[in-house]
Amino acid sequence: MTTLNPYFGEFGGMYVPQILMPALKQLEEAFVSAQLDPEFQAEFQDLLKNYAGRPTALTLCQNLTKGTKTKLYLKREDLLHGGAHKTNQVLGQALLAKRMGKTEIIAETGAGQHGVASALACALLGLKCRIYMGAKDIERQSPNVFRMRLMGAEVIPVHSGSSTLKDACNEALRDWSGSYETAHYMLGTAAGPHPYPTIVREFQRMIGEETKAQMLAREGRLPDAVLACIGGGSNAIGMFADFIDEPGVGLIGVEPAGLGIETGQHGAPLKHGKVGIYFGMKSPMMQTSDGQIEESYSISAGLDFPSVGPQHAYLNSIGRADYVSVTDDEALDAFKALSCNEGIIPALESSHALAHALKMIKAEPEKEQILVVNLSGRGDKDIFTVHDILKARGEI
């Protein structure tokens, strides 16, 4: 029996080998007690404020919306220590690991941002850290790989399958199956077996809480919509959580359409996948007609994931959130537009959410509306990827 509900409607659950059930139960119990422990909460809040740099800014775009009646705000998770929203929840999970008496952290990473966040939290709190990363992603994200190693983490290349995030997830779970007595698996997104989707949401929900308070202070009202990119879905659920019960606020999640949905080269399982069991949960995923997990694709390593967190699947099923998709090229255009017009270089992941916001503004330039894009990370890690693409096109 679990203390918390392991499902969001029909989605979620704990589809793991029996050997891992005690570890998940221990984690749930530690999380529930920590949420009620003022000392734990005070330590977590202190780290968020004085180490990570919260609250993060809410920035009004001065130039991107000229000639329209839209106010476009960016929630600046790119300013967080570590460069992305990932730092929020790893600090919480690292404190939980210490509370459970664990001495080691296992993590997986795609774009490398969760790996960097895990490495910095472990360095700070004195935990050993080993990080599984697809060999293809190691090539795409060499600056982040060096950052992880610089902070003392062991980075383990994964060559199986497509050598990307899903394969790193599989290897990390395999490792944890044999080491859970001393190691905590620091899952990087709001997916996987219960209680991870709930833990990650709660350790990210300050994004939306701060946004709500900042909007009321700046505008005297809530935004018309908040937008966030969707890979596994942690930055989005962190933004959405505090707005779910605000019916006047639209929730828009943006999946990667890659080379185009019609090509099959995408990472948009919410709208174009089928429900199945993968990575310890029941959720929509990209799969073949005979049920094999299909390879996802995105220009952005952090969105290159064939499934999605179960709470997003639920919000989609009840119509509370809208999920759309944006192609590589549209994300690249948004990446360039924000860099050129506002002096902010966004992560390619975040550029997907920005691209859809810009499409909304272009479609109705006379509409008076306030939009907030969760700028989930900074684009330093992506400049080499973007440089190579633009050079190949003759644009630079």
From Swiss-Prot:
SUPFAM superfamilies reported in the protein's UniProt record: Tryptophan synthase beta subunit-like PLP-dependent enzymes
EC number from the UniProt entry: 4.2.1.20
Family from the record: Belongs to the TrpB family.
The protein, known as: Tryptophan synthase beta chain
GO MF assignments: tryptophan synthase activity
Pathway field: Amino-acid biosynthesis; L-tryptophan biosynthesis; L-tryptophan from chorismate: step 5/5
Cofactor: pyridoxal 5'-phosphate
Description of how the protein assembles with itself and partners: Tetramer of two alpha and two beta chains.
Coiled-coil intervals: none
Gene (name only): trpB
Biological function: The beta subunit is responsible for the synthesis of L-tryptophan from indole and L-serine.
Entry-linked Pfam families: PALP
Modification N6-(pyridoxal phosphate)lysine, positions: K86
Alphabetically ordered keywords of this record: Amino-acid biosynthesis, Aromatic amino acid biosynthesis, Lyase, Pyridoxal phosphate, Tryptophan biosynthesis
Phylogenetic classification of the source organism: Bacteria, Pseudomonadati, Pseudomonadota, Gammaproteobacteria, Enterobacterales
Organism for this UniProt entry: Yersinia enterocolitica serotype O:8 / biotype 1B (strain NCTC 13174 / 8081)
Catalytic activity: (1S,2R)-1-C-(indol-3-yl)glycerol 3-phosphate + L-serine = D-glyceraldehyde 3-phosphate + L-tryptophan + H2O
Cross-referenced InterPro entries: Trp_synth_b_CS (IPR006653), Trp_synth_beta (IPR006654), Trp_synth_beta/beta-like (IPR023026), TrpB-like_PALP (IPR001926), TrpB-like_PALP_sf (IPR036052)
